[in-house]
Amino acid sequence: MNAPTTVADSVTVPVSLGDRSYDILIGKGLVERAGEEVAKRLKGVRVAIVTDENVAAVHLERLQASFARAGIDSTPVIVAPGEKSKSFATLETVTNAILAAKLERGDAVVALGGGVVGDLSGFVAGIVRRGMNFVQMPTSLLAQVDSSVGGKTGINTAHGKNLVGVFNQPQLVLADTQVLDTLSPREFRAGYAEIAKYGLIDRPDFFAWLEANWQEVFSGGAARTKAIAESCRSKAAVVARDERETGDRALLNLGHTFGHALESATGYDSSRLVHGEGVAIGMALAYRFSARMNLAGIEAAERVEAHLKAVGLPVSLAEVPGGLPPAEKLMDYIAQDKKVTRGTLTFILTHGIGQSFIAKDVPPAAVLEFLKERLAIA
């Protein structure tokens, strides 16, 4: 696993993919340094900055000024905030805006926003002119520690989440920790779920550190930077081993099979459930289901739930506002999960804290019965 290196006010985590390797820069002031960092790596480019209305109001002017100082022309493309922008309609709108600006294949798409903007922009960059340069500038904690790293891009459909997309690695990730100060407490908590996930997958020491230091992560400073860097280091190591998720990269989906089903069931309505909240509930359910299947002790599930509750995250189906459909309908959403192979269910389950594994051929009847029990409690 590549160790992060510290230079000036930022930490650099390398993602090792041969001639497609790139750096993740983590630290304060990277919006102001963006033009300089992009100019170092991509000579003579113009950029399209894809962002949403909320992020644009706070950060777009500073980013455009940074590019202007570096002699880089920029064209903003602003979309509506929220998961519903991960759609064919918005994909078409952004694509047409970039083509109308006459950007060329050697130019770059810059994603300034959270996971929605990053996933959408990366997909656009992968298909416009058969592939443009791509820079991630994640502005949410969730995007900084997860979706901006590793090259997964895409949009949602009526059939489920992230079902249409491409693998498209960025040339650079700039994670400005200062922009996290503008997040709502709910958004920050949602991103923290993905940080906790890395400890639960295979780093029990990191999970224990989070249990002891989560309040400092929330308040900012060195603990926050460390948590982000360690999360990126974990993900970078997995991506380097298994870029296209043919093996253990699937471990990164801990909590996501249940979580994505809940997002689909709530219509991607962020007033009811955001992605990180779905992941938190999904991880709690994965640990509960593992205990039910006699794969792990119930004390591991209780420890996970206790920590997620401590930071203010939901851990049960009862905490999803507006109610949920019957277990059979949730199973329909689970059947659309990307890990389904030839109709058989694959889950990320666990033997304990930091002992996650890929469980294939999980009996659908067992999952259905488990969901019925959890819904009954709700």
Curated annotation (Swiss-Prot):
Binding site residues for Zn(2+): 194, 256, 275
Protein name: 3-dehydroquinate synthase
Catalysed reactions, semicolon-separated: 7-phospho-2-dehydro-3-deoxy-D-arabino-heptonate = 3-dehydroquinate + phosphate
Name of the gene encoding the protein in the UniProt record: aroB
CDD domains named among the record's database cross-references: DHQS
Source organism (scientific name): Brucella suis (strain ATCC 23445 / NCTC 10510)
Lineage of the organism: Bacteria, Pseudomonadati, Pseudomonadota, Alphaproteobacteria, Hyphomicrobiales
Cofactor note: Binds 1 divalent metal cation per subunit. Can use either Co(2+) or Zn(2+).
HAMAP family hit by this protein: DHQ_synthase (MF_00110)
Pathway: Metabolic intermediate biosynthesis; chorismate biosynthesis; chorismate from D-erythrose 4-phosphate and phosphoenolpyruvate: step 2/7
